[in-house]
Structure formats: structure tokens, C-alpha cells
């Protein structure tokens, strides 16, 4: 028998699915999965940087400068048919050397939009998109 609740297992399966999808589709803004353990509900990924939260605390960055990059990777995930649904500064990772952005923590990722958007990040990237539509 397992010591995990059904909900924990569902969240783990959800997250594992996204990491495996990213590996299969070679999605560059999701860290590569290195290993996983279904019994212990552990997923190991390549270390690609630090959270945007830690980066901005430590390096003193302007979050607004990163909105276009966050919008790009968020919209790419949506194009694959999934909403992150937990988009927060701690779930956006940045490589401090080249400022490449990644998304992590896919427990709540779903084909339906259900983000509580507690940090207003989805609202910010959506608002900036509408006001700066580019003609193609």
C-alpha cells in the first residue's frame, strides 16, 4: 500500500505527463527530465537556474523586463494545448548567465484554464499582449 493520497498521485501523474511530453516534443522552455520514481512521487530534472523570485530578490531585477519572455513561453505551452494554472514567480526559472526562461511545477497544468493567478502574472502578460498587437 502507498502512503500517498489519491490527490497527490494525480498531481504527480499530471506533472510527470508534462515533463515526458516536453522530452518527447523537445520543448526547450521546460527543463529536461532526468529520472522519476512513481513509488516515491519524485521527478528529477536538469538544473537550469533559479526561480524568478530568487533572481529578482538577489539581483534586483525589474519584473516588467521579463514579461515579453514569460508571455512567449506561456503562449507556447498554450499552443501545445495546456494551461500552466499555477503561474507564479517561484514556478518561472531563469538561467542567470543567459536569462533564458523556463516553466516548472506542472501539478495543476490542464487543458482547461483554471489559474487562480494569485500574483497577477497571467493578467499582466495578457494585458500587455492586447495593447501591443503586431500586424503580420
List each language-model region with its residue ranges.
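Short, glycine/acidic-enriched loop or turn micro-motifs at the edges of active sites
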Residues: 49, 89, 108-110
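C-lobe/activation-segment region of protein kinase-like
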Residues: 66, 79-83, 95-136
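ATP-binding glycine-rich loop module of kinase domains
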Residues: 1-16, 20
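Conserved structural core of kinase catalytic domains
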Residues: 8, 23, 29-66
Amino acid at each position: 500500500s502507498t502512503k500517498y493520497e489519491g490527490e497527490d498521485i494525480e498531481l504527480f501523474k499530471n506533472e510527470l505527463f508534462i515533463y515526458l511530453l516536453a522530452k518527447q516534443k523537445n520543448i526547450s522552455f521546460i527543463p529536461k527530465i532526468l529520472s522519476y520514481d512513481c513509488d516515491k512521487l519524485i521527478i528529477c530534472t536538469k538544473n537550469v537556474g533559479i526561480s524568478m523570485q530568487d533572481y529578482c530578490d538577489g539581483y534586483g531585477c525589474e519584473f516588467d523586463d521579463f514579461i515579453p519572455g514569460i508571455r512567449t513561453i506561456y503562449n507556447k505551452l498554450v499552443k501545445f494545448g495546456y494551461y500552466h494554472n499555477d503561474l507564479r514567480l517561484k514556478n518561472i526559472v531563469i538561467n542567470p548567465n543567459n536569462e533564458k526562461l523556463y516553466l516548472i511545477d506542472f501539478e495543476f497544468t490542464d487543458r482547461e484554464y483554471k489559474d487562480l493567478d494569485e500574483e497577477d502574472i497571467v493578467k499582466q502578460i495578457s494585458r500587455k499582449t492586447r495593447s501591443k498587437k503586431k500586424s503580420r
